[in-house]
C-alpha cells in the first residue's frame, strides 16, 4: 500500500463536509 492518494484525500474532505453542510442547512431553516 502506498501513501494516501489524492483521491482518498478528496473523499475524506467530502465525508467531512457533508455533515457540516447538513448542519448549516438545518440552522438556516431554523433561523428563517
Swiss-Prot record:
Cited Pfam families: PsaM (PF07465)
UniProt-annotated location(s): Cellular thylakoid membrane
InterPro entries given in the database record: PSI_PsaM (IPR010010), PSI_PsaM_sf (IPR037279)
Record membrane topology: Single-pass membrane protein
Coarse class of the protein's main subcellular location: membrane
Keywords for the protein's UniProt record, in alphabetical order: Membrane, Photosynthesis, Photosystem I, Thylakoid, Transmembrane, Transmembrane helix
Record-level GO BP terms: photosynthesis
Residue ranges crossing the lipid bilayer per the database entry: 9-28
Family: Belongs to the PsaM family.
NCBIfam families (UniProt xref): PS_I_psaM (TIGR03053)
Protein name: Photosystem I reaction center subunit XII
The organism of origin for this protein: Nostoc sp. (strain PCC 7120 / SAG 25.82 / UTEX 2576)
